[in-house]
Amino acid sequence: MEESSVTIGTIDVSYLPNSSEYSLGRCKHTNEDWVDCGFKPTFFRSATLKWKESLMSRKRPFVGRCCYSCTPQSWERFFNPSIPSLGLRNVIYINETHTRHRGWLARRLSYILFVQERDVHKGMFATSITDNVLNSSRVQEAIAEVAAELNPDGSAQQQSKAIQKVKRKARKILQEMVATVSPGMIRLTGWVLLKLFNSFFWNIQIHKGQLEMVKAATETNLPLLFLPVHRSHIDYLLLTFILFCHNIKAPYIASGNNLNIPIFSTLIHKLGGFFIRRRLDETPDGRKDILYRALLHGHIVELLRQQQFLEIFLEGTRSRSGKTSCARAGLLSVVVDTLSSNTIPDILVIPVGISYDRIIEGHYNGEQLGKPKKNESLWSVARGVIRMLRKNYGYVRVDFAQPFSLKEYLEGQSQKPVSAPLSLEQALLPAILPSRPDAAAAEHEDMSSNESRNAADEAFRRRLIANLAEHILFTASKSCAIMSTHIVACLLLYRHRQGIHLSTLVEDFFVMKEEVLARDFDLGFSGNSEDVVMHAIQLLGNCVTITHTSRKDEFFITPSTTVPSVFELNFYSNGVLHVFIMEAIIACSIYAVQNKRGSGGSAGGLGNLISQEQLVRKAASLCYLLSNEGTISLPCQTFYQVCQETVGKFIQYGILTVAEQDDQEDVSPGLAEQQWNKKLPEPLNWRSDEEDEDSDFGEEQRDCYLKVSQAKEHQQFITFLQRLLGPLLEAYSSAAIFVHTFRGPVPESEYLQKLHRYLLTRTERNVAVYAESATYCLVKNAVKMFKDIGVFKETKQKRASVLELSTTFLPQGSRQKLLEYILSFVVL
């Protein structure tokens, strides 16, 4: 058998079937709608698959609807039944039909004519921001306070000089912070971006119905708050460009001061970007910089008061893992405070999902391998632009979620009878150390006691803002389209890690595409599956190896096993993780429950029977364990409720079946009568068939028992789901092993480096099952989780965080139980 192996980065196009026709996406669609390119099917495309694709392809779901439970009025607002049918369009496809002119010259100058006809003028944007902020009462108070600290015992004249000095400092800070939007620069940048985006993106897709909702929101004369996920530096320009193309004024963008570099900073200022410190506490003694905080607060308030649009990245920084990170709600709290003070009547919030076939940064392998982040510079920006012009990054999809009223959300939350949420320590320690009381089980028992709601109450305010941020990020993440590179990378890592024939990969790609659509997530691609798969393989570059087998005239696709390549594949694979995250949690929990029952010897003759109550509890505890990996569910739902719903889906799929009555009666009495420390909340209990409808619902209720299907396709799906969480659980379990050798106190940064080195060593020695378990993001998340559940105590010494073991986990036995708890979910 003759074989030749090449990486796709240097692939010989003669190896590709119908290479002359392999041009997926390179055509700029002449239709506004997203239509299939009419590619000729390649040889590995079977007639059966063609028939299945035409017959089974699902209608695209409309994503981004706001939460009906929290904002029922906004649910009906801006939306009508015709919006989902408006379809998609390619924003960067512009010709004379998008202008008022026709003819040969209009075709040649279509970009110039298009940007010239956009509605953007100086009157749209804020004026006199610096003076208004300096004259605000909060800033004046901060200036006086800082001046008093400079001259605590000074005379009136010295105090006046100190105030003038602080005012000059405040004005200088504002001059660096405040954006001066230039309509001319926006037009020029729009023209440049049309040229650039067409050179390194094949298209940028938006849903026309979503833009109609955004346009309707702009007509309310209320400030809009755009809150996108953060994947790439190009995010800053992308949103402004799309809004500009649709005659919607540019938002003011909160940018980190790491981008405050010569020339580039001027461009960002002219486009509406304003720079903020990445850390607000930058005084030499580590105290809060009250002057800077007051100026930033005043700046945001003034923009909102003048009905400007804002764009804030809740994650704070670009995601290095490919997953949506946890929220940092600092600036969002300023927005909430502004609304609470009745400065403005309302704010419309718009979560935004952004998906890339391939980010312009390519990957974050350097940082994931523990290398320090390189500071941005003018030279690095120039090199980045040159690099982008030499490559193509495929498709981009931007989804605008339905705008919702922030006022409605806040008022609704203030009236809900919700008790204070459990800390991770309260929720998880009883599961790790069973001798402790089970606080998680009593989570809902206090829900009937309605707390007094007062936005001035700091604890309630913090909880309210945190929940709002989680709500927004969950919606934005749910709105993110799944790209072809996400699915292909996921299949190669967690279904076919040893390699797979291209024809089989295409079949599995089609099946997974249908699974994604069935879960109401949209796709960022269209067309024949074999062409889309080849498109994804090309973009994944050196991460994938293609071997040509001349005997079968077939290709064999293998993921690269080098650590950087696996890290990169994992980054793109994580783009699809949120689609299956809850199902993966249930799959791992099924294993944990079965493994515990099998090793404990109490299963008796139960076979595959498992307790539904126990499964839901186990899954909920795993949700808590993984809560630092992103927003798993809406904050208006408990983990118990979400796990219960997901178990119901497994029953619908046929993966789990409710045991027959005779089988449930055969359950050993010791197991059937097992008492839990606390009852589950009402939605998670199951009535006995014999229980009288008028009986007290608080009495002990009968559990329900489930069977796990042994069908081959169901077992394969469970295995796939378990592998999705494999890297996370391996990282956490390895971190738990490393805790056994802890010698403290130790600076957190030093401990992170040691733990990361340990995980990388496991990978280099082929001890690790998943090489991607050694990413630096997982190291940080594992240590943060251990701090949250009380494994480590954290103290501050000279502005540095120092870790030491808590008294609870000083005994080796407690650390061993932590390890055993995490390992219970790990499928060996």
Curated annotation (Swiss-Prot):
Residues 80-120 are annotated as: Important for mitochondrial localization. The modification N6-acetyllysine is found at residues 780, 784. Residues 1-87, 119-828 are cytoplasmic. GO terms for molecular function: glycerol-3-phosphate O-acyltransferase activity. The keyword Transferase applies. Keywords: Acetylation, Acyltransferase, Lipid biosynthesis, Lipid metabolism, Membrane, Mitochondrion, Mitochondrion outer membrane, Phospholipid biosynthesis, Phospholipid metabolism, Phosphoprotein, Transferase. GO terms for biological process: activated T cell proliferation; activation-induced cell death of T cells; acyl-CoA metabolic process; CDP-diacylglycerol biosynthetic process; cellular response to insulin stimulus; defense response to virus; diacylglycerol biosynthetic process; fatty acid homeostasis. CoA binds at residues 278-279, 288, 293, 328, 462. It holds the Pfam family Acyltransferase. The modification Phosphoserine is found at residues 380, 688, 695. It is found in: Mitochondrion outer membrane. Its EC number is 2.3.1.15. GO terms for cellular component: mitochondrial membrane; mitochondrial outer membrane; mitochondrion; plasma membrane. Pathway: Phospholipid metabolism; CDP-diacylglycerol biosynthesis; CDP-diacylglycerol from sn-glycerol 3-phosphate: step 1/3. It catalyses: sn-glycerol 3-phosphate + an acyl-CoA = a 1-acyl-sn-glycero-3-phosphate + CoA; sn-glycerol 3-phosphate + hexadecanoyl-CoA = 1-hexadecanoyl-sn-glycero-3-phosphate + CoA; (9Z,12Z)-octadecadienoyl-CoA + sn-glycerol 3-phosphate = 1-(9Z,12Z)-octadecadienoyl-sn-glycero-3-phosphate + CoA; sn-glycerol 3-phosphate + (9Z)-octadecenoyl-CoA = 1-(9Z-octadecenoyl)-sn-glycero-3-phosphate + CoA. Residues 88-118 dip into the membrane without crossing it. It is a peripheral membrane protein. A motif (HXXXXD motif) lies at residues 230-235. Mitochondrial membrane protein that catalyzes the essential first step of biosynthesis of glycerolipids such as triglycerides, phosphatidic acids and lysophosphatidic acids. Esterifies acyl-group from acyl-coenzyme A (acyl-CoA) to the sn-1 position of glycerol-3-phosphate, to produce lysophosphatidic acid. Has a narrow hydrophobic binding cleft that selects for a linear acyl chain. Catalytic activity is higher for substrates with a 16-carbon acyl chain. Belongs to the GPAT/DAPAT family. The HXXXXD motif is essential for acyltransferase activity and contributes to the binding of the cysteamine moiety of the acyl-CoA and the phosphate moiety of the glycerol-3-phosphate. This is Glycerol-3-phosphate acyltransferase 1, mitochondrial.
